Amino acid sequence: MLLNVKGLDYKALNEALRQNSGDITIENCCGQRFIAAGMTDKNITINGVPGNALGAYLNGSTIIVNANAQDAVGDTMNEGEIIIHGNIGDAAGYAMRGGKIFVKGNAGYRAGIHMKAYKEKVPVMVIGGTAGSFLGEYQAGGVIVVLGLEATGKKIVGFFPCTGMHGGKMFLRSECKDVKFPSQVTARPADESDMKELKTYVTEYCDLFGYDMNEVLASPFTVVTPDSKNPYKQMYVAN
């Protein structure tokens, strides 16, 4: 189904999505917020730029955006996939606890903030370009991958990555010699076991966006995890 949303507010747009089943293509999207919030079993393609909180509370749908997206993509996402053929704004994956977000380009500040795993759910976010400051802030679970493709000399992450990180894992396609991590996390070169896990995420990314998986994986990766011997203590209540 083709849905022209020019001039439509987000409430009317979401109501139209709920009333229709099957594959839906949204045309002339221009900043409408909360698209597909909390929706299940939808396949949505968006032509245009969606506003903040795209796919918030998503619970099993697939969203493809053929452009950039704004802030808080996948906020508190539970299940499903969000695929962005462009860049995303700040706070992508805020508190997501399941599902996958794939971004062809760059991410703004605070990507993966408060990301967490829930029971058998493990959220995954793959950023093809670079990520801004405070990547993985307060990360409690899940996986963040940053590939730094076409970065043209730019650092793969901004300032203060992993601040407050106390769970989960991060893969960075770089030796990270110019990245300053907090003392409460451990950054080390990826080993064979790490690369086996990483291959799953990178393969899916490359299939979506047309990159060569072997070429991407040929570069060195750094794995970042919380340091159990030196955890953040002042930010959290002890169990």
Report each predicted region and the residues it spans.
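Long, distal/terminal scaffolding or interaction modules
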Residues: 1-239
